[in-house]
Amino acid sequence: MSKINLLLLCGGGSAEHDISLMSANYFETSLAKSEQFSVLRVELDKFGQYRTAAGDDCELTNSREIRFRDESKTPWPVDYVIPCIHGYPGETGDIQSYFNLIQLPYFGCESEASSNCFNKITAKMWFSALGIPNTPYIFLNQFDDAAIEQTQAALAQWGSIFVKAASQGSSVGCYKVDDSDKVAGVLKDAFGYAPYVIVEKTIKARELEVAVYEYNGEVVATVPGEIICDTNTFYTFDEKYAKNSKARTDVVAQHVSAEISEQIRAYAIKAFKGMKLRHLSRIDFFLTADNEILLNEINTFPGSTPISMFPKMLQNHGHDFTEYLSLVINGQLTAKS
């Protein structure tokens, strides 16, 4: 049986470029455990240039093959692609649109679902439409005096707020604000990352995460895990990835009742199905001291670094990551043929 030529595409050039490379390491190691795949790892930079791990400049063509700048190298036909790209252009849905155009099968959520989840404003509209509780918010479409006034009013009403660039991941462009004098500066910074900004009420709560993925035709939601941050901090980019991070992750959240756990899992599956996600996601919730459950955000291509929760929760649920990838890829290619 011939091997599947699998393109492992990583990087992307966004603020999460280096994290994407770390995740790609995990995918590459997992795929190497199967004899089904011939894997070519290619990094995409912020200028849209492709380069193999061996340093060869190349491009993905409309004919679904990798062509090398060195024309003496034989083009490499691509059967399947894993876009291991956090942020733009992967989680934004842009690169999936291109794959659809050239009819190249790919791993992960499709273009529209990716875009809807990546934009925090659009995502919250979907959460509300699906009847899933989420945090109170306002959104802003330009940086001006009116935006500053609206944000200061929200701060006065809620006591503490988060100002977030609407289309960034890994807490990029995300700021906790308790002082009205800082509103203008924070808004200016947030608008530097995205054309839209969302302002949310700060919720004092536990941060719980659920891995939701497709396995043998079923949508699976794991028991919630938990992010435990250092005192008076939130889960910033540095807290997520710095070697000296004081944040802790528990694959299984402690002291969560079976009833609450099941409700969180039910909301997660409802969001996955309702927003037509595919293959994988990590869905994050807040759990308040009063046991109020609030959907925070959905990550359509969760990190797979050594400290990332998605692969740990999948494994804890009893599923092997390599087998999971094989099932998804083979099922998709069989359906296509």
Curated annotation (Swiss-Prot):
Give the superkingdom in one word. Bacteria
Subcellular location per UniProt equals: Cytoplasm
Question: Which cofactor is essential here?
Answer: Mg(2+); Mn(2+)
Q: Name one GO biological process term.
A: cell wall organization
Q: Does the keyword Manganese apply?
A: yes
Q: Which residues bind ATP?
A: 154-209
> Signal peptide location in the record?
none
Q: Which Gene3D superfamilies match?
A: 3.40.50.20, ATP-grasp fold, A domain, ATP-grasp fold, B domain
The residues the record assigns to binding Mg(2+) 2 are: 297, 299
How the cofactor is bound: the record states: Binds 2 magnesium or manganese ions per subunit.
InterPro entries, sorted: ATP-grasp, ATP_grasp_subdomain_1, D-Ala_lig_Van_CS, D_ala_D_ala, Dala_Dala_lig_C, Dala_Dala_lig_N, PreATP-grasp_dom_sf
List GO molecular-function terms, semicolon-separated: ATP binding; D-alanine-D-alanine ligase activity; metal ion binding
Q: What class of enzyme is it?
A: ligase
According to its UniProt record, in which pathway does this protein act?
Answer: Cell wall biogenesis; peptidoglycan biosynthesis
Cellular component GO terms, alphabetical: cytosol
**Residues reported in the UniProt entry to bind Mg(2+) 1:** 284, 297
Q: Cite the EC number.
A: 6.3.2.4
Cite the entry's keywords alphabetically. Answer: ATP-binding, Cell shape, Cell wall biogenesis/degradation, Cytoplasm, Ligase, Magnesium, Manganese, Metal-binding, Nucleotide-binding, Peptidoglycan synthesis
Q: Where is the ATP-grasp domain?
A: 124-330
ATP-binding keyword on record:
yes
Q: Name one Pfam family in it.
A: Dala_Dala_lig_N
Q: Please report which protein family the annotation says this sequence is part of.
A: Belongs to the D-alanine--D-alanine ligase family.
PANTHER family associated with the record: D-ALANINE--D-ALANINE LIGASE, D-ALANINE--D-ALANINE LIGASE A
> Briefly, what is this protein's role?
Cell wall formation.
Q: What is this protein called?
A: D-alanine--D-alanine ligase
This chain's source organism reads Shewanella baltica (strain OS195)
Taxonomy of the source species:
Bacteria, Pseudomonadati, Pseudomonadota, Gammaproteobacteria, Alteromonadales
